[in-house]
Amino acid sequence: YDELHCHVRAKLGDVYGEDNVPQDGPIPAHLLGNMWSQQWGTLYDLMEPYPGVGDIDVDATLKAKDFSPKEMVRSAESFYASLGMPRLPDTFWERSQFSRPQDREVDCYASAWGMDGGNDVRIKMCINQTYDELRVIYHELGHNYYQRAYKDQPPLFQGAAHDGFHEAIGDAIVLSI
């Protein structure tokens, strides 16, 4: 991470000048896509590792293979399982919302839920076949796996020590896809 940070800071210093991006300090957040420095995708043109080679079109692949929303979630579950984490419980698959219901209005903003402080974890999304949505799925499952990791703790400890840690888990996993 330190090397990546140093590389990005140096490139930004070349573009914006060392007065704006000091080489011995943090990268100014407003140069990293949003004020929380979460979305570095806006830097891709500057950081592209192999200019001119072209991108992998994940959206087209998802559509060509006709991945359903549930299959997209299963791929994320398989990734977490490959890290030694348990498969999601059957209730997750029965009670989560993966697609927009046709019979009622719903809020489709993606969210993860730990319903009982135990194994009843869920996500609520209206999943489309896009790479961005796939990334959100991996992120939201990060919340669910973290919820399951602390389910056996006393109630006082059944939560993140800091809300940012919940976000960091999903965001760190998303870097792996």
Residue ranges and their predicted role:
Residues 1-177:
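Cation-handling catalytic/transport regions enriched in His/Asp/Glu
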